[in-house]
Amino acid sequence: MERLQSHRDFVTVLKRRRKAGGKDIVVHYLVPDDHHDDDDRTVHRRLGLAVSKSVGHAVTRNTVKRRFRVLARAHEDLLPAHCDIVLRAKPSAATASFASLDQQIAKAFATVAHKVAEA
């Protein structure tokens, strides 16, 4: 899974207002329409993390980001092949257990896949 790096990419995903979430996380997603390249077998999933100062100090925020990266990699196969994801942490994510975050991300990614399949 690649990373969303530019501010423009983050804003594009967040402005679409498509989201799924849980108690401690919100998953904003965007599935681009122009993904019909020469090779459709390639997978282009990009992940961005949004962990604000309301979550905690720098050490806490970095811990939350590390957890999100590990869990997103573990569940990325649930997502459509071409999509941009922004995982946004709610303040309660700092105190949530790893198992709880794991369940929430798996459920949110499955919800994203279901919503994309319906559209």
Curated annotation (Swiss-Prot):
Hydrolase listed as a keyword: yes
Entry's EC annotation: 3.1.26.5
A Gene Ontology BP annotation from the UniProt entry: tRNA 5'-leader removal
InterPro entries (alphabetical): Ribosomal_Su5_D2-typ_SF (IPR020568), Ribsml_uS5_D2-typ_fold_subgr (IPR014721), RNase_P (IPR000100)
Coiled-coil segments on the chain, per record: none
Pfam families per UniProt: Ribonuclease_P
tRNA processing among keywords: yes
Name the UniProt record assigns to this protein: Ribonuclease P protein component
Species per Swiss-Prot/TrEMBL record: Bifidobacterium longum (strain NCC 2705)
Gene that encodes the chain: rnpA
